[in-house]
Amino acid sequence: MAGNSKRRGAVRKAGTKKGPTVGSGGVRRRGLEGRGATPPAHQRPNHPAAKRAAKAAKQQQRRPARKTDETELVLGRNPVVECLRAEVPATALYVAMGTEADERVTEAVQIAADNGISILEVPRSDLDRMSNNALHQGLGLQVPPYDYAHPDDLLATAKADGAPALLVALDNISDPRNLGAIVRSVAAFGGHGVLIPQRRSASVTAVAWRTSAGAAARLPVARATNLNRTLKSWADGGLQVVGLDADGDTTLDELDGTGPVVVVVGSEGKGLSRLVRENCDAVVSIPMAGPTESLNASVAAGVVLAEIARQRRS
């Protein structure tokens, strides 16, 4: 129709959701291009995996790296005196102000002075802080990390003694107090050394030093890279490998401990690991009259060592 020849078609209103009335002229063409591969989950900021990774990284930054050469603080009068007598290369002796000077304190100060070890008198509160409020009896001795022996050194110690070897190996013992108490018992009953795994085991820390009452300065403690391999080597060398477990099929009364022997002590909770148990010549249990299911690992080790010492005296 002539009157409608110039009529405009429908025109989209500006600002509607469908966008402008005309094209972008290619300005937004990039939006049509692919965005590439989806990044891994830990690289997507809002993904739970990314949040976990960020949290772990922050915790790692906060956690101080453990120094391989950090010193230990041996606490208590007997442990300190035993370390000094054994000529452990200590760097400082701390004496709390007001400490009563008995024979052990006097001896500790005298040995330290004779060997050029720094003697520092400090407020008791300072020694409390340095020891994390552990019992120190007014004395603390700063010593380097424990110098572990080689497993072969334990056999050499027994050979030099001229007596049948009496060794103790620990399996799954993670409490340093148990380690210290066992070291003390081994020394008390004529043993020649203690063997611990290099990994997943308690180590000779200041806590173990104190619990051992200084016996760790006299008795060698060795570390084994592979406990089972070392036990097999000792068995090939003539040692009887005796496991100690509440479910053992042999009672302590039936054990012959007069020959060379290594007693393997498992933890109170886990007991002996499967491979260690398989490598034992015998697994011994301690007969008990009461309803107690098991003894603490260090107590059980002491009972067995006392029985072996009795047999060897007979």
Curated annotation (Swiss-Prot):
Binding-site positions, S-adenosyl-L-methionine: G266, I286, L295
Cited CDD domains: SpoU-like_RlmB
EC number per UniProt: 2.1.1.-
Gene Ontology MF terms in the entry: RNA binding; RNA methyltransferase activity
UniProt keywords, alphabetically: Methyltransferase, S-adenosyl-L-methionine, Transferase
GO CC field: cytosol
S-adenosyl-L-methionine in keyword set: yes
Entry annotated with the keyword RNA-binding: no
Entry similarity comment: Belongs to the class IV-like SAM-binding methyltransferase superfamily. RNA methyltransferase TrmH family.
Name of this protein: Uncharacterized tRNA/rRNA methyltransferase Mkms_4822
